From Swiss-Prot:
Residues 1-23, 203-222, 361-440, 454-479, 498-618, 1450-1474, 1580-1602, 1618-1662 are annotated as: Disordered. This is Cortactin-binding protein 2. It is found in: Cytoplasm, Cell cortex; Cell projection, Dendritic spine. The modification Phosphoserine is found at residue 1524. Residues 1649-1662 have a biased composition (Basic and acidic residues). Interacts with CTTN/cortactin SH3 domain. Interacts with STRN, STRN4/zinedin and MOB4/phocein; this interactions mediate the association with the STRIPAK core complex and may regulate dendritic spine distribution of the STRIPAK complex in hippocampal neurons. Activation of glutamate receptors weakens the interaction with STRN and STRN4. ANK repeats lie at residues 709-739, 743-772, 776-805, 809-838, 842-871, 912-942. GO terms for molecular function: protein phosphatase 2A binding. Gene3D superfamilies: Ankyrin repeat-containing domain (1.25.40.20). Residues 411-422, 583-597, 1582-1599, 1639-1648 have a biased composition (Polar residues).
Length: 1662
């Protein structure tokens, strides 16, 4: 007990301290209680509960044992172990209670304090327990929320994993695609490198070629100079030979004595020559045969034989290349010639020499490349090749082989046919083994000779005997006999005709029935292409004799012509053999000799009646009565051979299919004389064969048809159209008129099929079954409709035939009529109310059939023809057909009526899913497709079984049509904005121009639209800047102009679609098509960058001055500050200067400077003081004391030519050149004050002068300014008018440039040539002040169809501008020396009579040579307008015959030293006539008279003009009394212009294209004439040969131009005029008319050579 108490004592003693510490710790823990975790809170609660329980127990124990506790408390802590405790006990015991303080605290107080503390702690614990419970509840709620969040988290995690998997796959795919694309990029880069390498190689090659070309040009010029030299030597040699000839003629008197001896010798030679022709003539005849047969013309022997065999001499004209085909006559009775041999194909072909075989086959297969030389008398002679009239080419097909032999491949040039089963065919014309022919000749020539020698009197097919042509051996004069030529040509034609169908065996007896197997081989079938639409050309010969054919029936009959078929260019054939009609118009070189059977038309065919087939091929009826009808073809989708059909042969169980030929294996029943109405084509046979209508009755009358197993006479009579026999048989009793043969054909069927209307009427009257069908389900109406016998169809319909009867394949009569393009039958059936929508088993409708043939008329009838109202009879057919226009004209039914067929029928698809639109588009039948597209219900997006639309299968033309179905045509315009200022010569410049119309389709994207706009702009810029349809080489100068004006897509400032701005490359949400329709955009406007943007693109387009030159002008202004533009009046100087000033101003303002433009118009009264005030007021001239401002000043001085430059600008030249304060200049103002000024650095001075050149004192100003000369014969003025007028024409035609033959182009071309020729003549006259710029011609009206408007405008321009300027210039020149003191004004006011005459002559010459010449108006119409021109009635003979007697030598060019014309580049216009030697009066008159005498062979009108000129020379001095040398010089110049051959002949304006000869005064300008002579190109002898006799006479009688001088005036030595004449003829071929001035201009080197020649001629005169 004591131990326990002792052990507890220290704790009690420390209780107060622990209580205080515990309170602090409790305070801390209380603060951190919220942060305790769940486990810590539980532990805390358990500890506190333990303490509470322990204290409760202590309290209870202390209460129960209070005393013991007291004692223990007081004494229990003392023990013997601690001496200090004993001392304390003694201390306490030894003293009194009052004096001594207890060592420890009273236990009761301690207990009370502990109890109080425990109560507090219990309260706090209970509060914490309540807080812990509330937290526990929150914790539970948070646990639930956490679980929900965890579940959501799991779901999201799972979804995230799925997304990651998907993304991983996408990433893998993207990586794979990136790899592929990178590979492609590498490949494309490699390809690009290769292409660039190739481009570099091509560039190198082009550079090499250019170098070679330049070397060739140099070589050619050297050769031409050498040729000219040789020609002159030839002239000299000719004169020597002439002299020698005169000497030889002197000896003729001696030779007359020997005439008697020579006559005797001639008689002896004649007697000796009578015996020689028997030996020489056969060889000549043989050669003549070679010529006549091989070429068919009368050329030389060597040439003709070369054309026969040699392929080197191919003509460049593919149109005239005719294949040359000749048959080889097989040896009579030769067993080696097989029955199927065509053109004598030998079975023993191995015996032929390979050389001849290769040559023959190659020349036959490429026979079209052999040139033919037609004689001048015949326009078209094609005896050696296929034509519309001649017999077909035998090599155009390969003969079919028997069924046990493989078909031979079509021979191609250079490839030998290889066939393992059949013997090889080395040539279509291999010579037979036992044919005794000339071994060295071509087999075709041998065959032709054989035909000429043999069969001369063989009977032809009509039983007549043709008389053989006269032999060539009869007489040498027979070659000139026209009858012999005609007969020879007829013989060649007959030989070719026989060659097309050789006899395969002996003809069968007339009485024997035809058999289908006479020989060992089937007959020859043949096809040939015929050109469509070519009219029959009359060659002057009888029609070709038809080929011989054996009888085909039991009784002899007239021969049936070949089924020559005309392939319509808008459709293909439907007879099973699809002939590609594209090969008809192709060049012969690209067409193999053989029919190309199209294997691409994948269209199913139905077995329609095939007698005769639709006109598409040429069927030659084979001999021996063998059957030919059904066409087997390798075409995909064609009728199977076993399909039952009309006229199907019994022997065609397995039809022979040849890839590139057409095999025939069934009988064909020729059409007898049908009952068609007069005026229509009597039958397919006649219309297709090309025979003349006069032969039709003879050929087609009552001929029997092959009956092919018809056992009864009734069927024979019905098939042959024998009405008498048929009526007799019908009157017999017991005869079954409805009897059918094994094919199911009744008599009515046969009669309807062959078109015998009378027989049909008899049978129908005898109540024959009208709807009896054959084994294939075809009724008589089906047969008649298929063959096109519309009268039979009309009769059958009248007897209530079933018009909607469908055969086994579902073919109705309407379907068959559409399939065979029988328009009349279609019309009758439609009027009878037939059903248009009946479908065949293949799903084809009549619309499909009509479209498949490409017949537009049939399709229009189906779609638009309505059933007539009641009361309309068939007799009104003619009147209806007149109203019903099927040609698609303005009154076409589709323009008036709506289609009667529903949309379901138009969109109906056949078994393969093809609609009619699919068929039309795939075959390229654009007209049919267009008609289908007009139907509003057409669905062009309908897809077939292969998921293809109409557009997918269409040809290029049809694709274009489909794409433009709903296309919007929006005009594209170019705008240059407002042209400022308007008073600067810009009145004629247009602000807007329509360049084209853009087709915007539904599927057009914005990228495509952007490309289209850019391409349209580029094309337009190139079109207006290129030479285009102008051929102006005769009037343009030699310097080449840049073809590009510098504009491109980069010149665009903005584009507006209607009113919406748009830029290239920009895209909207809507497509362009929808955007245009929604915004109702009527036009697209392109605005070009202008001066406001600091660019000159709009200025370039408005004025047609190249952009590079405008930029160069701007650079000169910015660099030199002082620039003057000068040129002839009307050269747009003012416009150029103002546009440059605007551009410069906006550039300076964009750089941050203020800028101002100051204009000043200079006139005669403008003084130097006014100019000084202008400079000072505009701050250009600044006082020295004043500091300069940053303002930029642009001063424009206009019309400086009206003032004296030296007087006006003299004081300003020095300060303008040196603009600084260091070089000031003192100027005196108007008030008398003088001050020093200097020109501002920021001042730009520009001036304009309307003068071609400077003169006199004005030249002193020239070095102080930068001058820009605007020459009329150099850029930019030279091509400006051409480009401007071309743009004007394009704008007038809404962007479509017309053809060069259009009258608008011709009249604009004339206006352009007027400006050029006018300036050329004025420059030659030495009057540069009269030169005109292009400004006056910019207002040329362009009115299509009204050329008179332009001529009237030209007359007003001539009278108002040109004539006054020319008059003023001529007067000023004529009076420049005459009145030096008074100036020129007096002379202008009072011109002398001579000056007036000179002016009138000059105006008349200029009017005729420069203005009226080349006008495209007819002469009669031009004469009406000539009176409107001023000065056109002056007699030119006065000028042409004038000469000056008193003129001194050496003064011819004096006036030119003062009056300088524009500087000439490379001798341009430096005419050698200016330095020509003077001619005396006697020389000129003698020359005039001699020229008159030597030109008697010209026309009467020319003779009259020459006589008038001669008479006018008598009173020459009285009429022209000129008083000065300059006037005489001027007249001389006019005289040379009037007579020069380098200018137009003013006396023959209308006939200039036919005759280029000049006046009698053409010799007045000998040097110029010699120059023109020497500039002619040398002409070969071939070109000289066509000269007529009177031209040759003139060539021998004309005077030598080079020999004319003062010392040799009377020389009459002739000079060859062949060069002049032929060059004139060559000139007529070009568009230059008779103006050959280009020859002088374009040959500068030659002109220089002639100038030296002129100097040489001048020397003897001095």
């Amino acid at each position: 007990m004591a131990t326990d108490g002792a052990s507890c004592e220290p704790d009690l003693s420390r209780a107060p301290e622990d209580a205080a510490g515990a309170a602090a710790e409790a305070a801390k823990k209380e603060f951190d209680v919220d942060t305790l975790s769940k486990s810590e809170l539980r532990m805390l609660l358990s500890v506190m509960e333990g303490e509470l329980e322990a204290r409760d127990l202590v309290i209870e124990a202390l209460r129960a044992r209070r005393k013991e506790v007291f004692i223990q408390e007081r004494y229990g802590r003392f023990n013997l172990n601690d001496p200090f405790l004993a001392l304390q006990r003694d201390y306490e015991a030894g003293a009194g209670d009052k004096e001594k303080k207890p060592v420890c605290t009273n236990p009761l107080s301690i207990l009370e304090a502990v109890m109080a503390h425990c109560k507090k702690m219990q309260e706090r614990m209970s509060a914490q327990l309540a807080a812990a419970e509330s937290r526990q509840k929150k914790l539970e709620m948070e646990k639930l929320q956490l679980q929900a969040l965890e579940q959501e988290h799991k779901k999201l995690a799972a979804r995230l994993e799925e997304e990651r998997g998907k993304n991983k796959q996408v990433v893998l795919m993207l990586v794979k695609e990136c790899k592929q694309l990178s590979g492609k990029v590498i490949e494309e880069a490699q390809k690009l490198e290769d292409v660039m390498a190739k481009l570099e190689e091509e560039k190198k090659k082009t550079n090499e070629l250019e170098e070679e070309l330049s070397a060739e040009k140099r070589r050619s010029t050297e050769m031409e100079a050498q040729m000219e030299k040789q020609l002159s030597e030839f002239d000299t040699e000719r004169e020597q030979l002439r002299a020698k000839l005169n000497r030889e003629e002197a000896h003729t008197t001696d030779l007359k004595e020997e005439i008697d001896k020579m006559k005797k010798m001639i008689e002896q030679l004649k007697r000796g020559s009578d015996s020689k022709p028997s030996l020489s003539l056969p060889r000549k005849t043989k050669d003549r045969r070679l010529v006549s047969i091989s070429v068919g013309t009368e050329g030389t022997v060597t040439r003709s034989v070369a054309c026969q065999t040699d392929l080197v001499t191919e003509s460049a004209d593919h149109v005239k290349k005719l294949p040359l085909t000749m048959p080889v006559k097989p040896s009579t009775g030769s067993p080696l010639v097989s029955a199927n041999a065509k053109g004598s194909v030998c079975t023993s072909a191995t015996m032929a020499r390979p050389g001849i075989d290769r040559q023959a086959s190659h020349s036959d297969l490429i026979g079209s490349s052999v040139p033919a030389f037609p004689p001048p008398s015949a326009n078209r002679i094609e005896e050696n090749g296929p034509s519309t009239d001649s017999t077909p080419d035998p090599t155009s097909s390969t003969p079919p082989l028997p069924s046990n032999a493989a078909p031979p491949t079509t021979q191609t040039p250079g490839i030998a046919p290889q066939n393992s089963q059949a013997p090889p065919m080395h040539s279509l014309h291999s010579p037979c083994a036992n044919a005794s022919l000339h071994p060295g000749l071509n087999p075709r020539i041998q065959a032709a000779r054989f035909r000429f020698q043999g069969n001369a009197n063989d009977p032809d097919q009509n039983g007549n005997t043709t008389q053989s042509p006269p032999s060539r051996d009869m007489s040498p004069t027979s070659r000139d006999n026209l009858v012999a030529k005609q007969l020879a040509r007829n013989t060649v034609t007959q030989a070719l005709s026989r060659f097309t169908s050789p006899q395969a065996g002996a003809p069968s007896r007339p009485g024997a029935p035809p058999t289908g197997d006479v020989g060992t081989h089937p007959p020859v079938g043949r096809t040939s292409l015929k050109t469509h639409g070519v009219a029959r050309v009359d060659r002057g010969n009888p029609p070709p004799i038809p080929p011989k054919k054996p009888g085909l029936s039991q009784t002899p009959s007239p021969p049936h012509p070949q089924l020559k078929v005309i392939i319509d260019s808008s459709r293909a054939s439907n007879t099973g053999a699809k002939v590609d009609n594209k090969t008809v118009a192709s060049p012969p070189s690209s067409l193999p000799q053989g029919n190309r059977v199209t294997n691409e038309d994948n269209l199913p065919k139905s077995s329609s009646p095939q007698l005769p087939p639709k006109p598409s091929i040429d069927l030659t009826v084979a001999p021996a009565g063998c059957t030919v009808s059904a066409l087997a073809t390798s075409q995909v989708g064609a009728w199977p051979a076993a399909t039952p059909g009309l006229n199907q042969p019994a022997c065609s169980d397995s039809s022979l299919v040849i890839p590139t030929t057409i095999a025939f294996c069934s009988s064909i029943n020729p059409v007898s004389a049908s009952s068609c109405r007069p005026g229509a084509s009597d039958s397919l046979l006649v219309t297709a064969s090309g025979w003349s209508p006069s032969l039709t009755p003879l050929l087609m009358s009552g001929g029997p048809a092959p009956l092919a197993g018809r056992p009864t006479l009734l069927q024979q009579a019905a098939a042959q159209g024998n009405v008498t026999l048929l009526s007799m048989l019908l009157n017999e009793e017991g005869l079954d008129i409805n009897y059918s043969c094994e094919d199911g054909h009744s008599a009515l069927y046969s009669a309807a099929k062959n078109g015998h209307t009378d027989c049909v009427r008899l049978l129908l009257s005898a109540e024959a079954q009208i709807n009896a069908a054959d084994k294939n389900g075809f009724t008589p109406l089906c047969a008649a409709a298929a063959q096109g016998h519309f009268e039979c169809v009309e009769l059958l319909i009248a007897y209530d035939a079933n018009i909607n009867h469908a055969a086994d394949g579902g073919q109705t009569p309407l379907y068959l009529a559409c399939k065979n393009e029988n328009k009349e039958c279609i019309k009758l059936l439609l009027e009878a109310g037939t059903n248009r929508s009946v479908k065949t088993t293949d799903g084809w409708t009549p619309v499909h059939a009509a479209v498949d043939t490409g017949n537009v008329d049939s399709l229009k009838l189906l779609m638009y023809h309505r059933i007539p109202a009641c009361g309309n009879s068939f007799n009104e057919e003619e009147s209806e057909s007149g109203v019903f226009d099927l040609d698609g004209g303005e009154e076409s039914p589709e323009g008036i009526f709506k289609p009667v067929v529903p949309a379901d029928l138009i969109n109906h698809a056949n078994r393969e899913g093809w609609t009619a639109a699919h068929i039309a588009a795939s075959k390229g039948f654009k007209n049919c497709l267009e008609i289908l597209c007009r139907h509003g219900g057409l669905e062009p997006e309908r897809r077939d079984k292969c998921n293809r639309t109409v557009h997918d299968v269409a040809t290029d033309d049809c694709k274009h049509l489909l794409e433009n179905l709903n296309a919007l045509k929006i005009p594209l315009r170019i705008s240059v904005g407002e042209i400022e200022p308007s008073n600067c010569g810009s009145d004629d410049l247009e602000c807007e121009n329509t360049i084209c119309a853009l087709n915007i389709r539904k599927q057009t994207s914005w990228d495509d639209f952007s490309k289209a706009v850019s391409q349209a702009l580029t094309n337009h810029f190139q079109a207006i800047s290129s030479d285009g349809w102008w051929s102006l080489e005769d009037v343009t100068c030699n310097n080449t102009t840049d073809s590009n004006i510098g504009l491109s897509a980069a010149s665009i400032r903005s584009i507006t679609l209607g009113n919406v701005p748009w830029s290239v490359g920009q895209s909207f949400t809507q497509s362009p098509w929808d955007f245009m329709r929604k915004n109702k955009a009527e036009h697209i406007t392109v605005l070009l960058s202008g001066p406001q943007e600091g660019c000159l693109s709009s200025v370039t387009y408005a004025s047609m001055i190249p952009l590079q030159m405008m930029q160069n002008y701007l650079r000169l202004v910015e660099q030199y500050h002082n620039v003057i533009f000068h040129g002839p009046e009307g050269s747009l100087q003012d416009y150029i200067v103002h546009q440059l000033a605007l551009c410069l101003k906006h550039r300076q303002m964009a750089a941050g400077f203020s800028c101002e433009i100051v204009r000043a118009e200079i006139d005669a009264g403008f003084s130097k003081e006014q100019l000084l005030d202008l400079f000072i007021s505009s701050a250009c001239l600044i006082p020295v004391k004043q500091s300069p401002s940053k303002k930029k000043i642009i001063i424009i001085l206009e019309n400086l030519e009206k003032s004296s430059l030296s007087e006006l600008l003299r004081d300003f030249l020095a300060p303008l050149e040196n603009r600084s304060t260091e070089s000031p200049c003192t100027f005196q103002k108007g008030n008398g004050m003088s001050e020093c000024y200097y020109f501002h650095e920021n001042c730009f001075l520009m001036g304009t002068i309307a003068k071609a050149c400077l003169q006199g004192s004005d030249l002193l100003v020239q070095q102080h300014f930068r001058w820009v000369q605007l020459r009329w014969d150099g850029e930019p003025m030279q091509g400006l008018l051409q480009r401007f007028l071309r743009r004007k024409v394009v704008n007038k035609f809404k962007g479509q440039a017309p053809s060069p033959c259009d009258p608008v182009c011709k009249i604009v071309d004339w206006a352009l040539s007027v400006w050029r020729q006018l300036n050329s003549c004025l420059a030659r006259l030495g009057t540069p002040e009269a030169l005109l710029g292009p400004k006056y011609f910019l207002s040329c009206p362009v009115v299509p169809g009204h050329a008179q408007v332009t001529v009237k405008w030209m007359s007003k321009l001539w009278n108002g501008v040109i004539a006054p300027r020319v008059q003023e210039a001529i007067l000023s020149r004529a009076s420049v020396k005459r009145q030096p003191g008074f100036g020129q004004t007096t002379a202008k006011r009072h011109p002398s009579q001579g000056q007036q005459a000179v002016v009138k002559a000059a105006l008349s010459i200029l009017l005729n040579k420069a203005v009226l010449h080349g006008c495209p108006l007819p002469r009669a119409e031009l004469d009406q307008h000539t009176a409107d021109f001023k000065g056109g009635s002056f007699p030119l003979s006065i000028v042409s015959s004038y000469n000056s007697c008193n003129k001194k030598k050496g003064e011819s060019g004096a006036w030119r030293k003062v009056n300088t014309s524009p500087r000439r580049k490379s001798g341009r216009f430096s005419l050698p006539t200016w330095n020509k030697p003077d001619l005396s009066t006697e020389g000129i008159k003698n020359k005039t008279i001699s020229q008159l005498n030597y030109n008697r062979n010209v026309s009467l009108s020319k003779q009259k003009s020459l006589e008038n000129d001669l008479s006018l020379t008598l009173n020459l001095d009285q009429r022209l009394s000129l008083g000065s040398d300059d006037e005489a010089d001027l007249v001389k110049e006019l005289q040379s212009m009037c007579s020069s051959k380098s200018e137009s002949d003013i006396s023959k304006i209308a006939d200039s294209r036919d005759d280029l000869r000049m006046f009698d005064s053409s010799g007045n300008n000998p040097i110029l004439s010699a120059t023109i002579n020497n500039l002619r190109m040398p002409v070969s002898q071939k070109e000289v040969s066509p000269l007529s006799s009177h031209q040759t006479t003139e060539c021998s009688n004309s005077k030598s131009k080079t020999e004319l001088g003062v010392s040799r005036v009377k020389s009459f030595l002739p000079v060859p005029r062949s060069k002049v004449t032929l060059c004139s003829q060559n000139t007529k071929r070009s568009s230059s008319s008779s103006n050959t001035r280009q020859i002088e201009i374009n040959n500068n080197s030659k002109e220089n050579w002639n100038l030296h020649k002129n100097e040489h001629l001048d020397k003897p005169n001095k």
